[in-house]
Structure formats: C-alpha cells, structure tokens
Amino acid sequence: MKRIFLLAAGLAVAFAAMTPVSVAQTTSSAKAGGGQGKALTSKTIGSHADEVIGVFVNDANSQFATCSIDETIKLWSLPDGKELRTLTGHIGQVNNISYSGDDKYLASASSDRTVRIWNTETGAQEAVLKGHTAEVIGVYFSQDNSSVVASTSFDKTIKLWDWKLGVELKTLRGHSMQTNNVAYSYDGRLLASCSDDRTLKIWSTDAPVREALMTLEGHAAPVLTVLFSFDSKLLASSDQDGVIKIWSMPTGDLIRTINAHTGMIQDLSFAEDNKTIISGSIDGTVKSWNVESGENTMTHAAGVEVWSLDVTSNGNIIMLGCADGTVRLLSDSGNERGRAPKGGK
C-alpha cells in the first residue's frame, strides 16, 4: 500500500480528554538469524512496468489488486494469481487502492489529485472524485458502507466522500505535514490517519464531528502506515525508521514497540487471528510478528525492496508488490486452512 513519495525526503465526549496520548510500552527487536519459521515458496505471477506501490486483497479472498507508478491498476485472481484485467485512467502514479466491503468496487488514489472508483467485475470507472489540492496518497473504503471512502493527501487533509452521490462529506484538518495513510476500524466507529508530522490522529466517523478525538505520539520518524485489526481492538503503525507500534483501541494506549526492520516499512497487514502482523520493507525482507509478545515468527528475504503487501485472512498467501515491478505470491504449502472473510487491511 505504499507510495514513491516515501523516497523523497457519544465518541467525541469519551475521547475528549485523551489528546495527546503517550504512555509506557514494551519494546521488542528482531534478532539476526531468528524468527525464520517455515520456509515460504515465492512465485512471481506477473509485473507492472514500474514499482508496485499498492496491494489489497478483497474480502472474499478471491481477488487482489495492485497499483503502480506506471499509472495502472491490475486485478488478479486467487489462489492461482492469474491476471484478470488492467484498469487505466489515472494520469499520474497510482499510490493506493482499497476494496469496498462488498468487493464490488475498488477505490484508487493518485498523484493526479483524484480518487477514482472502479467496478471490479466490469473494470468500468464509476466515479472521479476531485477536491484535494495536492497528490492523493491514501484511500480506504468504509467497510460497512460501500458508498463512503476516505482519502489522504500531500495537502495535509483527510477527506470523506460519498462517491455514489459524488459529494465530499467533510474535510478533516489537524496534521501539520502531509497525511500518508488512512484506515477505518472494522466496527465502523473510528478513522485513523498518519502523517510526516510523526503522529497518528483518531477521528470519529460521526458526520458532525470534525476535530480529532485524540493524537497518538511516540514515533520518532514520519509515520507511513496505519491499520486496524479485524476486531478493531488494535491499531498498528509503521514508520520511516523501520519501527512498528501497536496501540490499544479505543483508549489509544501504546502497548508495544517493535524495532522490526533496518529500512522503512512500506506496508503492514493483520492476519485474521488479530495476533499476527506482516510487515514489508525496503530492506528487502518480509516478516511476521506476534503482536502480544513482539516475537519475530517469520523472516523471508525477498531479494528486492518490498513496497507493498497484503495477506489472505487465513495467512496462507502473502501478496507482494516490489520495486522491480514484479508481483509475487508467498505461500506455505504445508498450511492449507479453509478460507475466511478478510478484515485486517
């Protein structure tokens, strides 16, 4: 879910007293040579003409999408990894993508300053949302409402849209630098954003509320990714220094810091168990972590900068978008559990 700009330099009442939040927590580090777990099989299934900076799997685990600096979006089938179609229309690199909760639509964010909505069955472009005054970096569908989507931008704002009506619902302001990513909680109550200002902000999804409910502090570098767990009880964030932080929700308590990678972390994804998180980095590795203990449970050397990733809900397949333009599937052939609805990204 990452983008090339990284290389350049009653809820409101309940949360009102919680800004900013900064508490004691546990720190863990990856050990050299540790956390290898089972060996994963890597398969390159196709490619874009340039870096692949976004990956998102649909809720049914039957399809995933990738986006690229080459200005295109590609749809792929699961589990076989067959390329289904290429979506074109953006006139700038496509920075991020998100499926709607019902899997019928895909939202994309681009440096052309637009958010576009696509029909995943036909490939038709359903809407073009204009309003940001700079590159659009993050995009995320509300998982309980397929007409509502959030976006972030270099213009420092978060915008909420009803794409079916073609209207901007509200603009959220508060970050002092570019906003990098956004995510809805899966219970539909909260929205999280992260920024180069090294903070995360938590917002209410209630229409009248425009002020941040809380600001989460603790990162020492620009925060690149933010993501809720399936059960909405945890929030994960990653930064340019290769650090992951785990926050308890809805309190905002910082419960764990993981010194995960030697390069910036381009993407994160929760597994369905709410206890496992997968990270990918420009250090060329993909790792899995137990969020309760901070243990590094798997390390895979991709041999190339990992720009984006996602994982099927049962954890059987990890999809990678890489700096060399390749799209890869990592799988554990010894773990063939049944499929379940996704919800961790």
Please provide the spans of the model-predicted regions.
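A short helix->beta-strand "capping" segment at the edge of beta-propeller domains
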Residues: A30-A49
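Short loop/turn segments that connect beta-strands within beta-propeller blades
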Residues: L78-G81, T120-G123, W163-G166, T205-P208, ...
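WD40-repeat beta-propellers
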Residues: I73-W76, V115-W118, V139, I158-W161, ...
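WD40/WD-repeat beta-propeller blade N-cap
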Residues: I45-V52, T88-V94, L129-V136, R173-T179, ...
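Hydrophobic beta-strand positions that form the internal "hydrophobic ladder"
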Residues: F64, L106, V148-V149, L191, ...
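Residue-level detector of Asp-centered blade-edge/turn motifs that repeat once per structural unit
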Residues: D59-A60, G101-D102, Q143-N145, Y186-D187, ...
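Conserved strand-to-loop turn within each blade of WD40 beta-propeller repeats
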Residues: C67-D70, S108-D112, T152-D155, C194-D197, ...
